[in-house]
């Protein structure tokens, strides 16, 4: 990445995206705890002061990357679902979780966003994040509405429930990176209370109902 000053709006957008791309590479290779603005400056060849022109803190940068990864995941999931017809709710629930869990960095940042990133960024960055979550829910609700012919409000509630269930599963699952450190009773419980199990336990009972036909009771 060149250190020349980005002057035009397009150049600034390109530089911002380049910074995010490099940050993603570092996070995937070294992990969150090892990621610093110093390491990013070294890898990009930019001064730290330049990085702070685009992101006011490490947390703001990582939150922006999380939003980007989350948008990409929703894109992939919705595209893949076009081939999965006729719709099967239980199968969709499993595919939804699997598509999310396929990206380890997305999973890691999703677990950090609410308590480890958002509290440490300015209001503007928080607003951007909340709007991104709403955008994701709106797009997913469109899938539910189209595939299951449910009421729009129900489709929207279901989409939010799916996203909340992902967060809840990360917090409540009996699961660690190394389950061997768990006591025997928790290892046994973890066999039926993994993140995937907790997620499915929350969303499977929420199968959408078809919209009622307002003319269904009218006899010809």
Listing of model-derived features with the role each one plays in the protein:
Residues 119-149, 156, 160:
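Amphipathic alpha-helical packing segments from all-alpha helical-bundle domains
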Residues 2, 138-142, 146-149, 164, ...:
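C-terminal peripheral helix-coil segments that are non-catalytic and often amphipathic
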Residues 18, 26, 30-60, 64:
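Helix-turn-helix
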Residues 12-23, 40, 65-69, 73, ...:
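Generic hydrophobic, amphipathic alpha-helix propensity
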Residues 101-124, 174-180:
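Amphipathic alpha-helical segments used for helix-helix packing
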Residues 1-5, 18:
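N-terminal, Lys/Arg-enriched amphipathic/low-complexity engagement segments
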Residues 64, 78-106, 159-162:
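Hydrophobic alpha-helical connector segments
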Residues 62-69, 132, 136:
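Alpha-helical DNA-contacting segments of helix-turn-helix folds
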């Amino acid at each position: 990445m060149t250190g020349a000053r980005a002057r035009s709006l397009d150049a600034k957008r390109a530089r911002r995206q380049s910074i995010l791309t490099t940050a993603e590479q570092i996070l995937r290779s070294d992990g969150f705890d090892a990621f610093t603005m110093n390491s990013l400056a070294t890898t990009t060849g930019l001064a730290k002061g330049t990085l702070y022109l685009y992101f006011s803190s490490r947390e703001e940068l990582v939150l922006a990357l999380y939003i980007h990864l989350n948008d990409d995941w929703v894109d992939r999931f919705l595209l893949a679902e076009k081939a999965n017809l006729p719709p099967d709710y239980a199968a969709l629930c499993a595919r939804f979780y699997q598509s999310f869990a396929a990206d380890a960095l997305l999973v890691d940042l999703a677990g950090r966003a609410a308590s480890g990133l958002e509290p440490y960024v300015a209001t503007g960055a928080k607003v951007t994040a909340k709007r991104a979550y709403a955008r994701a829910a709106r797009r997913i609700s469109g899938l539910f509405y189209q595939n299951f012919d449910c009421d729009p409000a129900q489709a929207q509630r279901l989409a939010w429930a799916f996203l909340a269930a992902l967060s809840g599963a990360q917090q409540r699952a009996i699961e660690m990176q190394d389950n061997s450190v768990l006591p025997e009773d928790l290892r046994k419980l973890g066999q039926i209370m993994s993140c995937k199990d907790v997620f499915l336990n929350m969303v499977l009972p929420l199968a959408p109902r078809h919209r009622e036909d307002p003319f269904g009771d009218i006899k010809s």
